[in-house]
Amino acid sequence: MRKGQGYSYSVIASVLVLLCVVVSRIECSSQVHALSRLYLSKRGVGGSSTMDTSHFKAVKDLKPSSLRSAANQEGLRKRDLIRRLPGQPPVSFDQYGGYVTVNESAGRSFFYYFVEASKSKDSSPLLLWLNGGPGCSSLAYGALQELGPFRVHSDGKTLFRNRYAWNNAANVLFLESPAGVGFSYTNTTSDLEKHGDRNTAADNYIFLVNWLERFPEYKGRDLYIAGESYAGHYVPQLAHTILLHHRSFFNLKGILIGNAVINDETDLMGMYDFFESHALISEDSLARLKSNCDLKTESASVMTEECAVVSDQIDMDTYYLDIYNIYAPLCLNSTLTRRPKRGTTIREFDPCSDHYVQAYLNRPEVQAALHANATKLPYEWQPCSSVIKKWNDSPTTVIPLIKELMGQGVRVWVFSGDTDGRIPVTSTKYSLKKMNLTAKTAWHPWYLGGEVGGYTEEYKGKLTFATVRGAGHQVPSFQPKRSLSLFIHFLNDTPLPDTSRY
């Protein structure tokens, strides 16, 4: 091939294409695949891109007819009470699971799983947790692999307690969104072609309004919205939508986003710099990449031969790593065990957890206990959607939304597991730098149990950035105790401890 001859893939495809085969649909089997697919689609890989990447514009005309009457909500709430999940250890708090309609005419309903605080539920705040993808389940990741009260054993049948669950500090609501994710569904097939950031924020808003009719004691309660990965879009977009519609029963206090997709350009640049700084690629490879590849292009571009060669080398250097935690073991045997593995503990990450969760949530008795899959969906439950056909809009940045929220007094915390290679700490630092914030406290370690829990810096305008030492993309999966400590300090609006005595 002649020097300078064009290649059909954009530069980002060179690292991501091996993670998820390029086809016209958005579905993928895991969070890493789903996010990779989105980036490929945004840059026109595998065909021309029609995705809208302009700044987020919330739906302003959410019609009252979309908001379900509260008349029968008490009965629905009683029906949603989970008596006990199969294989569950005893607990002292209530759990609920069920559906909330977000669009009556389309037959669009979202599945939720709600766990009350383990103590002081009547005074504890409400946390809504969203996972990203786009197209991945908060039940699969947030609830059963990260911050929920249970984890799934290797037998795919039984559960064990997460002593560092976030319902130690809050009432926690997990949402599968948008329709087509997990147990959430639509009776209108064309809905699956209309997904994007804008419609997802609108539906999430309507869900929350209707859910509060079912659980009215949480109206006016301190509300926090949190999430990871592509929820770096979902969370500030929903917060913006809430503020836009001025409903008095929302008492939005803050947002919390982890290893979050914030700004495409800095997310990509930070990923490559992280690879080099962590000895995954050579200095020469990084220099050649920056010299020969256009890392700033927001649409499909032609790649030179030199760019293709160095990109292929980076592929080879990073292909056999778990990019979501570069130091984590890989799942080499996903076969379920007859009995739970001996010595299973919340502090030890199991790379095969995805498989245990998928087996558990596809058990008919589990779905019955959760009040899930009532319509008998024509496909198995999956951690990331296989039915969402298209993602129509995804802004290149959510920085304007974050700054807007700060300007309205909303507390913003951004955290980063420091072993994630997909949206690494370098990406987040570059994105924050682009915001031109003024530091309030200098960069310093924070502590838990006499050890460094991570590093943190506070900025004027109610924004805190914190790393979590030894954590990957799904921070609570790898460092449950440190993540809970961070969450509690976020809720209390107190600085992370700057002394090893803590």
From Swiss-Prot:
<keyword id="KW-0645">Protease</keyword>
<keyword id="KW-0121">Carboxypeptidase</keyword>
<keyword id="KW-0378">Hydrolase</keyword>
<dbReference type="InterPro" id="IPR029058">
    <property type="entry name" value="AB_hydrolase_fold"/>
</dbReference>
<feature type="signal peptide">
    <location>
        <begin position="1"/>
        <end position="24"/>
    </location>
</feature>
<feature type="glycosylation site" description="N-linked (GlcNAc...) asparagine">
    <location>
        <position position="436"/>
    </location>
</feature>
<feature type="glycosylation site" description="N-linked (GlcNAc...) asparagine">
    <location>
        <position position="103"/>
    </location>
</feature>
<dbReference type="GO" id="GO:0005576">
    <property type="term" value="C:extracellular region"/>
</dbReference>
<dbReference type="InterPro" id="IPR001563">
    <property type="entry name" value="Peptidase_S10"/>
</dbReference>
<dbReference type="Pfam" id="PF00450">
    <property type="entry name" value="Peptidase_S10"/>
</dbReference>
<dbReference type="GO" id="GO:0006508">
    <property type="term" value="P:proteolysis"/>
</dbReference>
<keyword id="KW-0325">Glycoprotein</keyword>
<feature type="active site">
    <location>
        <position position="229"/>
    </location>
</feature>
<feature type="glycosylation site" description="N-linked (GlcNAc...) asparagine">
    <location>
        <position position="373"/>
    </location>
</feature>
<keyword id="KW-1015">Disulfide bond</keyword>
<feature type="glycosylation site" description="N-linked (GlcNAc...) asparagine">
    <location>
        <position position="187"/>
    </location>
</feature>
<comment type="similarity">
    <text>Belongs to the peptidase S10 family.</text>
</comment>
<feature type="disulfide bond">
    <location>
        <begin position="136"/>
        <end position="384"/>
    </location>
</feature>
<dbReference type="InterPro" id="IPR018202">
    <property type="entry name" value="Ser_caboxypep_ser_AS"/>
</dbReference>
<protein>
    <recommendedName>
        <fullName>Serine carboxypeptidase-like 40</fullName>
        <ecNumber>3.4.16.-</ecNumber>
    </recommendedName>
</protein>
<feature type="active site">
    <location>
        <position position="420"/>
    </location>
</feature>
<comment type="function">
    <text>Probable carboxypeptidase.</text>
</comment>
<feature type="disulfide bond">
    <location>
        <begin position="293"/>
        <end position="307"/>
    </location>
</feature>
<keyword id="KW-0732">Signal</keyword>
<feature type="active site">
    <location>
        <position position="473"/>
    </location>
</feature>
<feature type="glycosylation site" description="N-linked (GlcNAc...) asparagine">
    <location>
        <position position="333"/>
    </location>
</feature>
<dbReference type="GO" id="GO:0004185">
    <property type="term" value="F:serine-type carboxypeptidase activity"/>
</dbReference>
<feature type="disulfide bond">
    <location>
        <begin position="331"/>
        <end position="352"/>
    </location>
</feature>
<keyword id="KW-0964">Secreted</keyword>
<dbReference type="InterPro" id="IPR033124">
    <property type="entry name" value="Ser_caboxypep_his_AS"/>
</dbReference>
